[in-house]
Amino acid sequence: MITFESSDYPNPKLEVFAEEISVAVRKYKSRIAILNTLLRQSGSSLQRYRLVFNKWKMPLNKRKSPPDLLEFASLLDQFDTICTNDEEWNKLRGVIAEKIFEPYFEQRHADACEKGYGVKVLIDNVPVKYRPKQITSTDSPRQSVDAGAWNGEQAEFVEIKFSPTAFQLKDINYLKLLETRLDEKHIQHTIYLATFNDIEFTKSVLKADNLIDDS
């Protein structure tokens, strides 16, 4: 049996703003490309985001630009007001990706008896916890998955990032451990890595970072 427990520390400020962004993106599908470009070019630096955003916003004209685009730009302009440092900035990036993904996961698993986001996975009441032998900049303890669902017979788990460059060794190693524990209990399952880039680019980045093999 699979159950879930809350793992992520709640940050209401970031959660609410991330939901606003996700609603705006789902309303106009073209906005995901804008958001993806801005976040990719900004990387992990909040200060860099301001420079990238200002450059993107410069050609916009209040009289000629579509009102919905100006509205979206106004929302994007709040990022460095909502976030006070790079740690919050990187947390927000992840929460936005999860919020955009959640409605699709909800619809896909509408009948699941167990479902959760940012949760610990418990198999027969035993939590799956990854603890590396040596902690490095990319490999550290991990004990949660971004999205999980269980219908009583089969489980599905998803790790979500805006860009494949955001995946770290700890993410992959945790999912490998999770798969091992599921196999030991003979539980049918699927595990996905989800990004907002195309499949081939995602694969190429993960292979280049030695996070997946060529199979």
Identify the residue ranges that each predicted region occupies.
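Intrinsically disordered, low-complexity Ser/Thr/Pro/Gly-rich regulatory segments
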Residues: 1-215
